[in-house]
Amino acid sequence: MEFSTQTTASLHQIKTAALAVGVFADGVLSAAAEVIDRASHGAVAAVVKSEFRGRTGGTLVLRSLAGVSAQRVVLVGLGKQAEYNARAHASAEQAFAAACVAAQVGEGVSTLAGVAIEGVPVRARARSAAIAAGAAAYHYDATFGKANRDARPRLKKIVQVVDRAASAQTQLGLREGAAIAHGMELTRTLGNLPGNVCTPAYLGNTAKKLAREFKSLKVEVLERKQVEALGMGSFLSVARGSEEPLRFIVLRHAGKPAKKDKAGPVVLVGKGITFDAGGISLKPAATMDEMKYDMCGAASVLGTFRALAELELPLDVVGLIAACENLPSGKANKPGDVVTSMSGQTIEILNTDAEGRLVLCDALTYAERFKPAAVIDIATLTGACVVALGNVNSGLFSKDDALADALLAASRQSLDPAWRLPLDDAYQDQLKSNFADIANIGGPPAGAVTAACFLSRFTKAYPWAHLDIAGTAWRGGKDKGATGRPVPLLMQYLLDQAG
């Protein structure tokens, strides 16, 4: 999608397929809605009084209003005026874009970013507007037959009407939001593709395609022999159960930071299990199809790299993706097996369905060579995190308060929420093994915490945080599909680090 700005005092003269104006739940019209109301001789106020309640995200389309050039005026609910905030604004922008999609129009004009929010600058409002619109306009049809693909017109452009003084900051925010939306689109599509299409090799080829598109990106894709030479015994043990060959993907964004005495790069590590049947510890059949989403950590790394490369962010960033399948076979891991990780630590595999940590631990050890300023791993790691936090907050684990605080601040600003969970040393006792340095599970209690504790054993050399996105990377049910999270959180963190 494209986003741009327009400055005008004559909203009623704008020629567009759809014009969005905000209405609060208490019947108060936004400044833009008042302009359209006057031009239409009170038509907006009359509708608001009789049938439009202005609830957050609600819409009502008015066609061919007298005195207004727009083909459609879309009334968008902003909720209660006293409670209007950044999240309500994002919901309104997404609702407008969804209304445009439903009306099959290719472009629209929004006045919503111009509605002031205390403590939220126009740049941030514009950024969230673009992200929200991109989410509403997303459409998946990659695996439909030609006859069943949706051929309706796509929403391609939204223009934000702003004051002249706010135009530059709005344009900057829209540019940032558009890049994040494009990254989320890639992340969602990779997640939604089936496991027989989105294989480890497919992820590697996607990374190479990004490097061809963006000059700031360099990509190296390692295969089995190279991974064996590195001594990644834990990662290899998971991959051994599948006929699909593994890939270890290394992405580098050379951002040319302004600081000469710069710290090392930020490293993003993504879990890339392109299908997880659980291995010998086989998962139940019900909803196993959703285990194609077990690579959403890897997908979010690729989506984030697409966004930061589009923005040419002045920050050095490295991405690491350990990609393979976790399937049962005669060569698969067995409960009780002991494997040696790249770090030299031995691991007793008590449950082969706790495989994400087995591939991540070697990637986290590999990250040491970059002398990173910070390492953040992203993984659909535990069902226990879903039990704890549901589908709203991603789980955040870190012993580094500064890194955790920066990520939490980014989560709030990006409207991509995370919640910090404990990482106390006392939980490490659950991972004791009689036969190896560490067990790969710690029993039912505090499953998300002990999974993070396991990973922490491989992160002593740098500041580290773990994002468990098992509850937030995709939705189930009738709206089943990948969400694109936590690309907004990660990009906001990187934007903050770049200054």
From Swiss-Prot:
Keyword presence, Metal-binding: yes
Residues reported to bind Mn(2+) 2: K271, D276, D294, E355
Catalytic activity: Release of an N-terminal amino acid, Xaa-|-Yaa-, in which Xaa is preferably Leu, but may be other amino acids including Pro although not Arg or Lys, and Yaa may be Pro. Amino acid amides and methyl esters are also readily hydrolyzed, but rates on arylamides are exceedingly low; Release of an N-terminal amino acid, preferentially leucine, but not glutamic or aspartic acids
Main location: cytoplasm
EC number: 3.4.11.1, 3.4.11.10
Main enzyme class: hydrolase
Active-site residues per Swiss-Prot or TrEMBL entry: K283, R357
Keywords for this protein: Aminopeptidase, Cytoplasm, Hydrolase, Manganese, Metal-binding, Protease
Binding positions (Mn(2+) 1): D276, D353, E355
GO biological process: one example: proteolysis
Keyword Cytoplasm on entry: yes
Cell compartment(s), UniProt: Cytoplasm
Cofactor detail note: Binds 2 manganese ions per subunit.
GO molecular function, one term: metalloaminopeptidase activity
Cofactor(s) listed in the protein's UniProt record: Mn(2+)
Source organism superkingdom: Bacteria
Gene Ontology CC terms: cytoplasm
Described purpose of this protein according to its UniProt entry: Presumably involved in the processing and regular turnover of intracellular proteins. Catalyzes the removal of unsubstituted N-terminal amino acids from various peptides.
Family in the record: Belongs to the peptidase M17 family.
Descriptive protein name: Probable cytosol aminopeptidase
Source organism of this protein record: Bordetella parapertussis (strain 12822 / ATCC BAA-587 / NCTC 13253)
Lineage: Bacteria, Pseudomonadati, Pseudomonadota, Betaproteobacteria, Burkholderiales
Gene field: pepA
